[in-house]
Amino acid sequence: MPLWQIYHPPGVFEDAESKAALAADITKIYTSVGLPPFYVVVHFNPIAPTNVYVGGTPKSFNPTPFIRIVIKHIAIRLNNDTATYRKTTGMIDNALKPHVYDKGWDCEYHVEETERRLWKFNGLIPPEHKSKEHEVWVRENKPVPYEGAYWSVEKGQY
């Protein structure tokens, strides 16, 4: 799952329309590479400017809002090469452009890759990307039980 945690000052992403538009553009990044939409989770977290310090100084709303984004990738690991990383950050930048950059807001983000084996949906181990089970999850847009999706602690097996 991609998990986006967007930290922003009050007055930014306040209305449902602006949140929905950004979340839709973020979701397109991942559906374009074959992930089901339900994998994509976006949290909007308003943070008072008095609670954000940049360089040891409180970051006030004026003159420019500061947006901090933490992105966690779990479903797919990126190839460890500059071209892949640049393509990925380019896709992220394109999604952010109309919602953040074009408004002149300051924005910083980073992407973390989390261990896939520590990830579950409703107790199910997500199927491997592009497997037949994965295609069912994409088609149904929800977790669907399949053989091997459950780990039995008692038996030490699937």
Predicted regions span which residues?
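A domain-level signal for the structural core that forms small-molecule/cofactor-binding pockets
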Residues: M1-Y158
